[in-house]
Amino acid sequence: MEEGGQQKGITAAFPPPPPFWKKFTPENLERLEKAKREAEPQALSRKWSPEALHALKLAPELRYLVPPELPKEGSYSLFGEAQSLSTQLPSLEEQGIEQLYPSSLTNETAGPSPDHAYYLLKISKSLLLNFLELVGILSINPEQYEPKIEDIRNLFINAHHLLNLYRPHQSRESLITMMEEQLEQAKEEIREMEQTKERVEIYLRELEAEGRNVSPNDEPVQTPESGPHNTKTQTSESQANGEQVLWKLLDKVEES
């Protein structure tokens, strides 16, 4: 099988890291922290910006440890590919790809339209039809496969682009659902606190009623068998009973 005139370069899915990763050693990190302390001994919790770190006149091997400035506009490189900072989804026409559905569906401000599902279904059926046509072409004239492969590729791109138009709407719906769950959880916690408060108030009223039945001026009846020792014993027993009531109250509150 003859190879085409143009050969595509082989690139790794995850390219190796830049060579300066070897500069990120514990010794260099300690030297960088030492340079920060020497510059401002009193500012221990300061957040250094890349511009301020570059102003410290660091050694060449320490400059690799300074993070670059965050890009504010334009694009950045990710695994060798340029990525745009703009969150707006570019249209297929801007990317030089044929668009198979009306441009009215790309209006993100109008929100999702029922037509999205209709055109997604049409694209799915077209994919099945084009696949059957591709099988027929490969069985009759395999050399004529490229146009049909391009049609299938275009259909997949349109389907993915149409699905990506749902991303803003999906994000809003996910945020609404998350906030509703947090609100319901907060309401449930408030209801549990109110129920616990009511139970505690009931227990306190019961204790108050029991305390009113006992007069503070009541003294133990002196009998021939009673004496100072027996009086102290009765007092300690009443205190112990009061403590047991309080502990039972706390146990009931915890169980409920």
Curated annotation (Swiss-Prot):
SS bond list: none
Q: Which residues form the signal peptide?
A: none
- What are the boundaries of the region Disordered? 1-20, 208-244
An example Gene Ontology molecular-function term: transcription coregulator activity
Keywords, in A-Z order: Activator, Nucleus, Transcription, Transcription regulation
Q: Which GO terms describe its cellular component?
A: core mediator complex; mediator complex
Q: Where is the composition biased (Polar residues)?
A: 223-242
Q: Where in the cell is it found?
A: Nucleus
Q: Which GO BP terms sit in this record?
A: regulation of transcription by RNA polymerase II
Q: What Pfam families does this protein's entry cite? A: Med7
Primary location class: nucleus
- Kindly state the subunit structure of this protein: Component of the Mediator complex.
According to its UniProt entry, the function of this protein is described as:
Component of the Mediator complex, a coactivator involved in the regulated transcription of nearly all RNA polymerase II-dependent genes. Mediator functions as a bridge to convey information from gene-specific regulatory proteins to the basal RNA polymerase II transcription machinery. Mediator is recruited to promoters by direct interactions with regulatory proteins and serves as a scaffold for the assembly of a functional preinitiation complex with RNA polymerase II and the general transcription factors.
Which family does the record assign? Belongs to the Mediator complex subunit 7 family.
PANTHER family recorded: MEDIATOR OF RNA POLYMERASE II TRANSCRIPTION SUBUNIT 7
| Record-given protein name | Mediator of RNA polymerase II transcription subunit 7
